[in-house]
């Protein structure tokens, strides 16, 4: 349940989050496992183990889980089976098969192999902050986040969202933090960053390297590079990598945070889940608020 990434979206207009209605809407897109002829399935799964509810809610915070099952068919296995069939049929009919015939054969091969294929399951968590009209998604890629949002949009009928963007250019702020050594008091720069030039392929990745290094500072001072990613630590609470597109990757909560609710018995799974969710959302909501303040608020939209 602890988020490892944070991609945040702004609801451009408030929605009515009636929980009874939400449950009904989510049930229309509930996850069901792949049948023998299904290549993939995508739908809502219960966040709380053993619960029939397809959402988990505390106060004004809602948690959803989008589950995806994909059948894994290695391309070389499909190709080998297909090549055998094509060769056999061409010899039998003494002619070369047409492209459309080969595609039909391939579809048939896939359908025959699917029942024996392994499954890969993927869970994507969506945290809806109804108080601040934000949706946070635990996803490392825009595609995965957009897929989850598309499922929510399908369930609700509409979902007016845009990626959260800051008023001040993040790369400019990040660069100034390193150049002028003026990070906010609540943040500590770690020894990892990515420097980007004007050319897309002109990227320098620094790892386990002090960022006050003379060569790094010279590149930034000359304007040849800007800081596009920066590893940070926040108040001994968590570490993360902040990206210039306003996304957060590799979130890692401190052990002292994750152990805060250890006094709750392991047998009381629901209470522990509740307490951890409240703790996590409180921390990440505060982090989002602090970042918004530090980057000049939210970018104005036309």
From Swiss-Prot:
Q: Which UniProt keywords apply?
A: Cytoplasm, DNA recombination
Q: Does the keyword Cytoplasm apply?
A: yes
Residue ranges that the Swiss-Prot or TrEMBL entry lists as coiled coil: none
Q: What InterPro entries has UniProt attached to this entry? A: RdgC
Q: Which GO terms describe its molecular function?
A: double-stranded DNA binding
From the UniProt record, give one GO term of the biological process aspect: DNA recombination
Q: Which Pfam families match?
A: RdgC (PF04381)
Where's it found, cell-wise? Cytoplasm, Nucleoid
Would you tell me the Gene Ontology cellular component terms?
bacterial nucleoid; cytoplasm
Similarity comment text for this entry: Belongs to the RdgC family.
Function in brief: May be involved in recombination.
Among NCBIfam families, the record links this protein to: PRK00321.1-3 (NF001462), PRK00321.1-5 (NF001464)
What is this protein's record name?
A: Recombination-associated protein RdgC
Q: Which species?
A: Haemophilus influenzae (strain ATCC 51907 / DSM 11121 / KW20 / Rd)
Q: Which gene encodes it?
A: rdgC
């Amino acid at each position: 349940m602890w988020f490892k990434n944070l991609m945040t979206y702004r609801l451009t207009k408030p929605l009515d989050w009636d929980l009874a209605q939400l449950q009904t809407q989510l049930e229309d897109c509930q996850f069901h496992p792949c049948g023998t002829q299904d290549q993939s399935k995508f739908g809502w799964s219960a966040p709380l183990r053993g619960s029939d509810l397809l959402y988990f809610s505390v106060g004004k915070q809602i948690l959803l889980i989008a589950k995806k099952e994909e059948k894994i068919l290695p391309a070389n296995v499909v190709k080998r089976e297909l090549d055998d069939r094509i060769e056999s049929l061409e010899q039998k009919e003494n002619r070369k098969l047409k492209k459309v015939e080969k595609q039909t054969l391939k579809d048939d091969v896939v359908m025959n192999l699917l029942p024996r294929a392994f499954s890969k399951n993927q869970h994507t968590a969506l945290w809806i902050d109804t108080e601040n009209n934000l949706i946070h998604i635990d996803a490392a890629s825009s595609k995965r986040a957009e897929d989850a949002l598309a499922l929510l949009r399908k369930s609700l009928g509409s979902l007016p969202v845009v990626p959260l963007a800051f008023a001040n250019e993040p790369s400019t702020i990040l660069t100034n933090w390193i150049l002028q050594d003026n990070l906010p008091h609540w943040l500590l720069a770690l020894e990892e960053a990515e420097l980007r030039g004007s050319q897309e392929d002109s990227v320098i990745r620094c790892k386990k390297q002090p960022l006050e290094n003379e060569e790094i500072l010279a590149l930034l001072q000359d304007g040849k590079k800007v800081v596009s990613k920066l590893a940070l630590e926040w108040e001994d609470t968590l570490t993360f990598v902040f990206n210039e597109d306003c996304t957060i990757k590799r979130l890692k909560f401190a052990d002292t945070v994750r152990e805060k609710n250890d006094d709750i018995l392991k047998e009381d799974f629901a209470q522990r889940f509740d307490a951890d969710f409240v703790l996590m959302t409180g921390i990440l909501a505060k982090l989002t608020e602090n970042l918004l303040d530090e980057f000049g608020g939210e970018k104005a939209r036309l």
